[in-house]
Amino acid sequence: MNPIVINRLQRKLGYTFNHQELLQQALTHRSASSKHNERLEFLGDSILSFVIANALYHRFPRVDEGDMSRMRATLVRGNTLAELAREFDLGECLRLGPGELKSGGFRRESILADTVEALIGGVFLDSNIQTVEQLILNWYKTRLDEISPGDKQKDPKTRLQEYLQGHHLPLPSYLVVQVRGEAHDQEFTIHCQVSGLSEPVVGTGSSRRKAEQAAAEQALKKLELE
């Protein structure tokens, strides 16, 4: 991999790996090698959840568990992680197999999000919990400063349903129109039909649930509720 690209990535991350092989593994999709990033992703997912939960607990001492859970879900969901990945220009650093390269895997939200979690796992193994916690807080500073408890943190499907019920409109319908990829790495495409919108809105995700949430979020934007 191009060392100039890797050095630029590490500057954007705010962390230089002592063991470069951990960085290489974190950037490797299972389509490219048997030594891929899924175990690091598993580790990073748990670390990220803990760090964000801890930050919210101390930032909002009077907020109940339900609101904190919703805020955490907003901060650690796939599209937020994919936004971070794009801020790091992570797509140009991914190691993908020929099939994923051809199908534009370097732009796919699920792959970008999973790689951010793998990087978190890699940083932890390369350093310690204090270092990776501070790094995550640096990445999330603006988002943590801007987030607040309340209905906005309900997931998109819930907010869309409540809006439609409040206006005495039928509930949305979700239809799977495409499933791409192998069983271990699928991408679902959902059409969501909503009263008041002339055409179905489209959402994609690594599971049916995530794709439905993405479609609901697009519907909310079209209804100008975001």
Curated annotation (Swiss-Prot):
It catalyses: Endonucleolytic cleavage to 5'-phosphomonoester. Residues 155-225 form the DRBM domain. It is found in: Cytoplasm. Mg(2+) binds at E41, D114, E117. GO terms for cellular component: cytoplasm. Residues 6-128 form the RNase III domain. InterPro entries: dsRBD_dom (IPR014720), RNase_III (IPR011907), RNase_III_dom (IPR000999), RNase_III_sf (IPR036389). GO terms for biological process: mRNA processing; regulation of gene expression; rRNA processing; tRNA processing. Its main location: cytoplasm. It holds the Pfam family dsrm. Its EC number is 3.1.26.3. Its cofactor is Mg(2+). Keywords: Cytoplasm, Endonuclease, Hydrolase, Magnesium, Metal-binding, mRNA processing, Nuclease, RNA-binding, rRNA processing, rRNA-binding, tRNA processing. CDD domains: DSRM_RNAse_III_family (cd10845), RIBOc (cd00593). NCBIfam families: RNaseIII. Homodimer. Digests double-stranded RNA. Involved in the processing of primary rRNA transcript to yield the immediate precursors to the large and small rRNAs (23S and 16S). Processes some mRNAs, and tRNAs when they are encoded in the rRNA operon. Processes pre-crRNA and tracrRNA of type II CRISPR loci if present in the organism. This is Ribonuclease 3. It comes from Salmonella typhi.
